[in-house]
């Protein structure tokens, strides 16, 4: 099968190819006419200072606040703190700066070297809203994108690194029995985070190759196709506006 993108070995990605597909995905978000969706769904292209590698970060509220003021507080008053020696670089583009709707929160680093007690992004004291952070990293062994995810600020002090919390807050009902039957191989797995080394959940990439082989897509659409396959089982759907073809 001929593929539009210039891949070295489809559907695997080299480090350079992963950088490109991440950049294309970020630009789709920046240019898409998302309207109010931008207030509850944030995508950022980031780069770690420790390794220089790129990754995609996606921030989503688990529940929409009833009041608009609370929604604004939840996303616009993140405690960014001061960037320290281990912070990652937020790769904002000039195109996004021109987008009046793209009010992306300035998150404190999660992925540097030495981390202080305030390293994880938290909402302001005025608006504690539970949320999930998804990250797309290149797996060093499978050479495929891998979806990592962490829960934050759950109500009543519920544990965030807990498989039952994942099923309660992220996994749609139609996926629960299938994921539980799959187990840790090919389903939801847990391991040290690829950057922080802190335990985190991820979707095991062992079956991604077979799923991607049936598609023919350019690098510009690689992550759109990939997330369409792996994201839904943990509550991640890419806004359809991002799939619109540019004029």
Predicted regions and their residues:
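Extended, low-hydrophobicity segments enriched in charged/polar residues
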Residues: 1-132, 139-142, 154-246
């Amino acid at each position: 099968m001929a593929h539009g993108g210039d891949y070295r070995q489809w559907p695997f990605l080299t480090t350079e190819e992963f950088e490109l597909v991440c950049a294309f995905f970020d630009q789709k978000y920046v240019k898409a006419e998302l309207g109010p969706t931008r207030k509850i769904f944030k995508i950022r292209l980031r780069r770690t200072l420790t390794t220089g590698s790129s990754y995609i970060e996606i921030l989503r509220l688990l529940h929409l606040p009833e009041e608009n003021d609370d929604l604004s507080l939840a996303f616009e008053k993140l405690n960014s703190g001061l960037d320290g020696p281990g912070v990652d670089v937020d790769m904002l583009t000039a195109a996004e700066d021109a987008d009046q709707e793209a009010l992306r929160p300035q998150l404190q680093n999660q992925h540097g070297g030495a981390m202080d007690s305030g390293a994880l992004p938290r909402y302001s004291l005025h608006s504690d809203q539970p949320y999930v952070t998804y990250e797309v990293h290149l797996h060093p062994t499978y050479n495929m994108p891998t979806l990592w995810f962490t829960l934050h600020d759950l109500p009543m002090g519920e544990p965030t690194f807990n498989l039952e919390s994942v099923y309660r807050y992220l996994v749609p009902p139609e996926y629960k029995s299938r994921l539980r039957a799959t187990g840790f191989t090919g389903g939801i797995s847990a391991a040290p985070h690829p950057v922080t080394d802190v335990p985190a959940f991820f979707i095991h990439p062992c079956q991604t190759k077979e799923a991607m082989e049936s598609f023919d897509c350019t690098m510009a659409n690689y992550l759109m196709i990939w997330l369409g396959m792996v994201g839904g089982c943990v509550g991640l759907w890419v806004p359809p506006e991002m799939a619109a073809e540019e004029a």
